[in-house]
């Protein structure tokens, strides 16, 4: 059995719902046990993470369109601080973004910014709470990434 940590921040409950369902799916279908860390519950505390993890980040940005304005992250910054602290970034397999497609260019923009900032891949995205198809699709991506990481 393989272990994986999912590090995320959930403000409205959508990301938490997705993480719970993804964890259950990974356990049942791929025999991967997950440990979850909701950064919101840490109250800006950081600590070293020594195992491989996937970051999951909802999109909260200042107003705007994501092109000319509205590119500045709000509310979810503690996840970036956690990844940057203690060289945790070296254990991150990649990031999954979530958002609302009604926001067009801002959809999952924060996750794309993290991928560029930290140099890890954007593994995928889902809208709002995600669908069962999103769970299956992203689980496959995670399994492939975890397998590649373990073989290197």
Curated annotation (Swiss-Prot):
Superkingdom of the organism of origin: Bacteria
Alphabetical list of InterPro entries matching this protein: Flavoprotein-like_sf, RNR_NrdI
Cysteine disulfide links: none
BP-aspect Gene Ontology terms: protein modification process
UniProt record similarity statement: Belongs to the NrdI family.
Matching NCBIfam families: PRK02551.1
Protein name: Putative NrdI-like protein
Organism field: Streptococcus pyogenes serotype M18 (strain MGAS8232)
């Amino acid at each position: 059995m393989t272990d994986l940590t999912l590090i995320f921040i959930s403000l409205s409950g959508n990301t938490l719902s997705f993480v719970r369902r993804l964890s259950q799916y990974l356990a049942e279908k791929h025999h991967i046990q997950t440990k979850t860390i909701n950064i919101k519950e840490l109250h800006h505390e950081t600590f070293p993470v020594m195992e491989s993890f996937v970051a999951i980040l909802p999109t909260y940005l200042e107003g705007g369109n994501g092109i000319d304005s509205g590119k500045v992250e709000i509310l979810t910054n503690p996840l970036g601080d956690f990844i940057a602290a203690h060289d945790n970034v070296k254990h991150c397999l990649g990031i999954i973004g979530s958002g609302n497609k009604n926001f067009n260019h801002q959809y999952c923009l924060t996750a794309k910014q993290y991928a560029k900032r930290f140099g890890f891949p954007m593994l995928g995205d889902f809208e709002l709470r995600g669908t069962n198809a999103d769970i299956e699709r992203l689980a496959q991506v995670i399994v492939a990434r975890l397998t590649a990481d373990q073989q290197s």
